[in-house]
Structure formats: C-alpha cells, structure tokens
Amino acid sequence: VLSWDTDTVDMDLLVTEPSGEICTFSNSFTKSGGRISPDIRDGYGPEEYLIRNAESGTYQVAARFKRDRRFQLNAGVHVKVDVFTNYGRPNQQRRSATAFLEKKGDRTVVAEVTW
C-alpha cells in the first residue's frame, strides 16, 4: 500500500515481481496473478498491489513521482509503503518503509519482500 504526504502530486506504485514483470496502473494484471488498484491522481493515495498466491522470490516495491500540480515544489514528497503478508489471517504481518522523492521523474525502491 503506497501513500504520500502531498495532495497535489501524482505518485505511482510499481511492483517488480520475481519474474521481472512490473505491475503498475498501465499493466494492472500480471501473468502470476498480481493486480494493482486504479491510478490515484488526487489526494494522498493509497495505491495498492495484491497477489493471493505469491511466487517464491523477491518483490521490489517502488514509487515514482509522476506529476506535480503546484507551480513549484520545494519540499519534495515523502512516501510510505505498508507491506502486509498473510493479510486477514492470524499470522498477518505488517512492515512499513518510507522514502523521499525530490522531484518529478524520481523513482526509488521503497521496500523489498522475499517470499
């Protein structure tokens, strides 16, 4: 789950699956069953990725600073990724990670999950 702290920007969630396929709003359903929520262009998010039967390997969770609707952005954008495994089950776990993106076009890996 990707969220951010500035409501005038468009951030994108990108998840690179172990196969190398990237799940994002322009490729919202992957061959391995991953899916992503519609692109959120207003507000603070969230954008979400879900996979029910995760393949073994490492998933990279990245954020991309796509657009800014302000005339000038001086402070950048803080993003937060919450990763849930075994969601809704007794053994559910949650990890959070944050990152800072300075300007439009920036992209960074915020978290990695090995399954």
Where would I find each of the regions flagged by the language model?
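Intrinsic-disorder/low-complexity signal
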Residues: 1-115
